[in-house]
Amino acid sequence: MNILYWSLFTVVVYCYAGLPLIAVINGLAKPRKVKRTDFPPGLTIIVAAYNEEQQIQHKIDNTFASNYPSEKIQLIIASDGSTDQTSSIVNYNTDPRIVFLNLPRKGKNATLNSAVKHAAHEILVFTDADVSIDANALSQLASHFSEADVGCVAGNFQYIGAGNDGESTHWNIDRWAKKRLSRSGSITSATGALYAIRKSLFRNIPDGVTDDFYISTLASRQKKRILFDENAISFGNGVNSTGDEFTRKVRIAVAGLKGVWHQRKVCNPMEFGMFAVQLFTHKVARRLGAIPIIIQFFVLSAIANTSPVYMALFVLQLVFHLLALTGFLLRNRKAGQCKIFALPYFIDMVLWSGLVALYHLILSTRMDLWVPDRNT
């Protein structure tokens, strides 16, 4: 039982400390120089929209408020069967740089596939309708593409307003890891709020996968780097409702695991080296980490009385999960936003969402069509 417990303990540590450890090791390597250019390439900015009447005009205004040369920008807004006033609002804008596609409801991935066919420029920039971008963000993204080995550049998403302390801590750790991984190698994938990729690398997105993961890893699949630019900043709100957030995480986990399966070629360390290990650690092991955690918890409960060390570890785990439960019960109160409750609660929510996602995958459950997450 002792050997079993420590084996499981090692697996758990790998699931959750593996990526930060890889980031630390990667950060020790000599940084690879990226020659940036001031010659701006043409950008096609693509926004998939579903019932975005409250935000779409702001998205248009925010995009053209960028300091990027206006003649180098094309904005494609693709409506995925919107039933509100989104179409009317976009059509009211007569700017020739705007291309509006009023498509039937087929889901976000099909909408993006259709939009790319109308792209006039070589660099595709994907961003969400409810996300605001900093005036310098487009210039920051575009400047990296003077290097032939750079295929994709991810922006730096920052929460404003809503979102609990646990989620914020998660994003801070993720941002730190991306900075170190990007110095001399490649990050795992981009976040959908804002990222850019060469049009020549794009392939149609399959149904049922996370679009940002699939699109960005097309770069690594074709032996190009995925960089992170902390100065390409975008802003957006978190999701207040715990039920909505849990459902969103389940949906993302299901689509993310499907995406890894579709991109399983890049999980081969013989061909893709450390990137393959990095990808498996971040996108598979972390999402399924609840399995070894649950098994080792029951093993630990069986051997807790045999050693003060095991008893201490067992008590620590109980305390952690009790703090998570308290965070759940206080989630709509100010006290529930404290890190001591919010962080354990967020971690446990991610664990359970991974298990539920695995359940859906085993049963081949079809998730509902994409509906944007909104902070209402």
PLM feature spans:
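Short, acidic, metal-binding catalytic loop of nucleotide-sugar glycosyltransferases
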Residues: D61-K72
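Long helical/loop segments within the catalytic core of UDP-sugar-dependent glycosyltransferases
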Residues: P104, N109-T111, T127, A135-V209, ...
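Catalytic donor/gating beta->alpha subdomain of glycosyltransferases that bind UDP-sugars
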Residues: D95, F145-A154, Q158-D174, D207, ...
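A conserved acidic beta->alpha catalytic loop
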Residues: N62, S79-S87, P104-K106, V131
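Short aromatic/hydrophobic "clamp" motif used to bind/position activated sugar donors
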Residues: L124
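N-terminal membrane-anchoring/stem segments of glycan-assembly enzymes
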Residues: M1-T37
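Membrane-embedded multi-pass helical conduit in multi-pass membrane proteins
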Residues: I3, T37, G236, R286-R366
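Acidic helix N-cap motif at the loop->helix transition within catalytic regions
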Residues: Q54-H58, K72, T83-Y92, N136
